[in-house]
């Protein structure tokens, strides 16, 4: 039996050493999620954990490739944490329609 999406989420969170169970802080005056019909739009996810932006700068210039990978994981986990919180379970997510950077 494959692990649930929530279990996989928790495993990745443990691997990178951050919990995404609390409030997902945003850094401006915008709404991070908008629900419309059966879709959730998520915006503005940066590599922030709590009140700290963990990685800054351009990969290859101000930051390493490894730091860039960590930043991408944190952004992805933040983007998944929001529907997990609003829906209660990532198993309810049917598909991800689009990701833009």
Regions found by a protein language model. Name each.
Residues 1-101:
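Short, polar/acidic, helix-capping and beta-turn segments at strand->helix junctions
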């Amino acid at each position: 039996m494959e692990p649930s999406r929530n279990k996989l989420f928790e495993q990745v969170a443990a691997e990178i050493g951050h919990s995404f169970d609390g409030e997902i802080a945003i850094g401006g005056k915008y709404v991070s999620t908008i629900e419309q019909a059966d879709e959730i739009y998520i915006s503005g996810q940066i590599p922030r954990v709590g009140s700290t932006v963990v990685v800054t700068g351009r990969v290859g210039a101000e930051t390493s490739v490894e730091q860039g990978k960590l930043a991408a994981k944190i952004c992805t986990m933040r983007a998944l944490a929001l529907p997990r919180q609003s829906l209660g379970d990532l198993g309810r997510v049917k598909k991800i329609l689009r990701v833009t950077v």
